[in-house]
């Protein structure tokens, strides 16, 4: 299907005046905006709270973030508290939200805010973007919400709304300049905080990816995708490559005292700084048991006996999927060495909840607690 756009690339970025779009959207928002804690005083006036909410909402749904929000500030009430916290405590507080680089960046950025800005979140776009984990749209979201500055945003919801509004004939990733121009044109000088939040709410509740509720949309009369009956085809999606699937052998290694061996991943990279049960990828024509023995010898320098299967955990990351085949194992000989990790520890099952683990590993922990209820 050839998509049609009624707006030439060289013309105005919006199909009607910004004032018309602002008025209709803000009227809708005043009646239907979502009731979220980071939008209410005093939180909405606190850039630290807005900042944490913006980071947590990256690639994570609101309903998932809500239970974490107040717990985070109970643990780290101020930027100074976060900056001086141990990274392991920060990762533990983030446990379950995923995309742990966000927590590491929050921690490092808090330290930089203390060092460079006297503990006050910066008020300029350039200074905000200079902090780890903050790009243009996150900075715009923080500064427009906390300080009511007229800055555009372009998260996933807003891209979809604007792509439909202007009937964007190509995938959003191929026309970011046009979408930024549209977002900048539509932002309100009088109510930028509310306008940006209204855009996000419109995408989250009305202009959804599937089955958009066009008949109740405040922009229905101006939406070029709706007017040309293309709302189901826009935004244009690009073909996705097949997602690789990895089979992983995982060892829950126990010593005669009933302790369990865990290791901490390197600080950089996927799941950096988190603890896990050791193991690795199954090679072609290799059994799960042989994989586990080989990986433990290579990574920790010890010999083990591979026992019964405890659980199989299927988990999806952004760019690949894994199946973790978890076996109970017995430590035979050798002192564990941190060869391919940053640290190793023997811990009891009662102590294990003190350490931050990836979500897939927390499933293993629950299986262990059921298997050894008296440990």
PLM features: residue spans?
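Catalytic cores of DNA base-excision repair glycosylases
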Residues: 2-4, 17, 28-215, 219-228, ...
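N-terminal strand-loop-strand
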Residues: 230-276, 305
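Acidic pyrophosphate-coordinating catalytic loop
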Residues: 240-244, 268, 313-324
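Short, well-ordered beta-strand micro-motif
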Residues: 252-253, 326-330
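The catalytic Nudix box helix
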Residues: 277-311, 348
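NUDIX/MutT-family hydrolases
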Residues: 328-372
């Amino acid at each position: 299907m050839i998509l049609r756009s009624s707006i030439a690339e060289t013309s105005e970025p919006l199909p009607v005046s910004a004032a018309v779009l602002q008025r209709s959207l803000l009227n809708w928002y005043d009646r239907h905006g979502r009731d979220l804690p980071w939008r209410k005083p005093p939180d909405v006036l606190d850039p630290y709270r807005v900042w944490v909410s913006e980071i947590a909402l990256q690639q994570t749904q609101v309903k998932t973030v809500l239970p974490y929000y107040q717990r985070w500030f109970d643990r780290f009430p101020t930027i100074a508290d976060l900056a001086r916290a141990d990274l392991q405590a920060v990762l533990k507080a983030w446990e379950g939200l995923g995309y742990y680089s966000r927590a590491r960046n929050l921690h490092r950025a808090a330290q930089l805010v203390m060092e460079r800005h006297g503990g006050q979140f910066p008020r300029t776009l350039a200074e905000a973007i200079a902090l780890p984990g903050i790009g243009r749209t996150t900075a715009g979201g923080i500064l427009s919400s906390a300080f009511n500055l007229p800055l555009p945003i372009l998260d996933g919801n807003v891209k979809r709304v604007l792509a439909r509004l202007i009937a964007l004939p190509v995938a959003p990733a191929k026309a970011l300049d046009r979408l930024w121009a549209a977002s900048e044109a539509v932002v309100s000088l009088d109510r930028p905080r509310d306008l940006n939040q209204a855009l996000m709410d419109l995408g989250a509740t009305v202009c959804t990816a599937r089955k958009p509720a066009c008949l109740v949309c405040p922009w229905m009369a101006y939406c070029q995708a709706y007017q040309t009956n293309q709302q189901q085809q826009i935004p244009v999606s690009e073909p996705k490559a097949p997602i690789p699937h990895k089979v992983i052998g995982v060892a829950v290694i126990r010593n005669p005292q009933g302790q369990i061996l865990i290791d901490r991943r390197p600080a950089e990279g996927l799941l950096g700084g988190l603890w896990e049960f050791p193991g690795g990828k199954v090679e072609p024509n290799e059994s799960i048991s042989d994989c586990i023995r080989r990986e433990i010898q290579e990574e920790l320098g010890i010999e083990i006996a591979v026992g019964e299967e405890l659980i199989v955990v299927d988990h999806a990351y952004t760019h690949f999927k894994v199946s973790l085949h978890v076996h109970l194992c017995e430590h035979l000989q050798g002192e564990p060495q941190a060869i391919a990790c940053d640290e190793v520890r023997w811990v009891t099952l009662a102590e294990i909840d003190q350490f931050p683990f990836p979500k897939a590993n927390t499933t293993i922990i629950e299986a262990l607690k059921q298997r050894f209820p008296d440990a």
